[in-house]
């Protein structure tokens, strides 16, 4: 397996860097006025990737904060992955043609599987499938709806269609700093035989070490958000902690 990659997260709403609790738009904390400044800070601490979420886009169903995404992709020596409201071929092409390394397709994977399969066929590893689950079932529409589809079943189906990278979020853990759902992340990796990036709940370097210890199952990285913003640890400390394992 390749190395374990850390993805510092920048969630964008109204052009600012924010965090929500469990995806609740009414529980918002603003951490900065400039996504580019935040990304620059992470790059200076050693980030190789930046994970961007367009929260306005997730709600609206089309891209909203794309100018900030392109500013980061074009001016920093990091790879960028973007999710949030990307539901059309035009939006996928827009990002990939403008220097974004990976586009995350989320709720459309349930509601419009033909679109997702077409994008996988066209762009391969530049597409990541975001699987957000609540109690093991896939959640859609910016976490506002829960489907009757099991996370592993969706993963297996899309792996057959060419998906190489999944991002798994346990919604109940997200923004709670209660530790990641390692078991569910590993289950998805084993079910699909593909790379799975863990997201949600990471509160310590020890949490990252637990996930990194599952590299052989296919758990290939972790997205870190609130822990960095609430200064539980710095990105530099996380990188150093993984180097020691």
UniProtKB/Swiss-Prot annotation:
Query: EC?
Result: 5.3.1.16
Q: Which domain of life is it from?
A: Bacteria
Q: What is the lineage of its organism?
A: Bacteria, Bacillati, Bacillota, Bacilli, Bacillales
**One GO cellular component term noted in the UniProt record for this chain:** cytoplasm
Annotated GO biological process:
L-histidine biosynthetic process; L-tryptophan biosynthetic process
Substrates-to-products reaction catalysed:
1-(5-phospho-beta-D-ribosyl)-5-[(5-phospho-beta-D-ribosylamino)methylideneamino]imidazole-4-carboxamide = 5-[(5-phospho-1-deoxy-D-ribulos-1-ylimino)methylamino]-1-(5-phospho-beta-D-ribosyl)imidazole-4-carboxamide
The protein's name is: 1-(5-phosphoribosyl)-5-[(5-phosphoribosylamino)methylideneamino] imidazole-4-carboxamide isomerase
Q: Which GO terms describe its molecular function?
A: 1-(5-phosphoribosyl)-5-[(5-phosphoribosylamino)methylideneamino]imidazole-4-carboxamide isomerase activity
Kindly list the places in or outside the cell where this protein is found, as annotated in its UniProt entry: Cytoplasm
Keyword terms, alphabetized: Amino-acid biosynthesis, Cytoplasm, Histidine biosynthesis, Isomerase
Instruction: List, alphabetically, the Pfam families matched.
Output: His_biosynth
| Known pathway | Amino-acid biosynthesis; L-histidine biosynthesis; L-histidine from 5-phospho-alpha-D-ribose 1-diphosphate: step 4/9
């Amino acid at each position: 397996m390749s190395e374990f990659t850390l993805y510092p997260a920048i969630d964008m709403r109204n052009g600012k860097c924010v965090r929500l609790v469990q995806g609740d738009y009414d529980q918002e904390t603003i951490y900065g006025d400039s996504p580019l400044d935040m990304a620059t800070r992470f790059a200076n601490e050693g980030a190789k990737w930046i994970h961007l979420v367009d929260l306005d886009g997730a709600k609206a169903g089309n891209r909203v904060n794309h100018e900030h995404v392109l500013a980061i992709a074009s001016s920093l020596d990091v790879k960028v992955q973007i999710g949030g409201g990307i539901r059309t071929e035009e939006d996928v092409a827009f990002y990939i043609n403008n220097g974004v390394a990976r586009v995350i397709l989320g709720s459309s994977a349930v509601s419009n599987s033909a679109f997702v399969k077409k994008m996988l066929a066209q762009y391969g590893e530049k597409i990541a499938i975001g699987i957000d689950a609540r109690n093991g079932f896939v959640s859609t529409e910016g976490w506002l709806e829960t489907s009757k589809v099991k996370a592993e079943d969706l993963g297996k189906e899309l792996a057959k269609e060419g998906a190489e990278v999944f991002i798994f979020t346990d919604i109940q853990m997200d923004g709670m700093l209660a530790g990641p759902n390692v078991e569910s992340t590993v289950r998805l990796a084993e079910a699909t035989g593909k790379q799975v990036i863990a997201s949600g709940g990471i509160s310590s370097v020890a949490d990252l070490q637990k996930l990194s210890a599952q590299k052989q199952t296919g758990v290939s990285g972790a997205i870190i958000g609130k822990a960095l913003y609430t200064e539980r640890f710095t990105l530099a400390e996380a990188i150093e902690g993984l180097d020691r394992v």
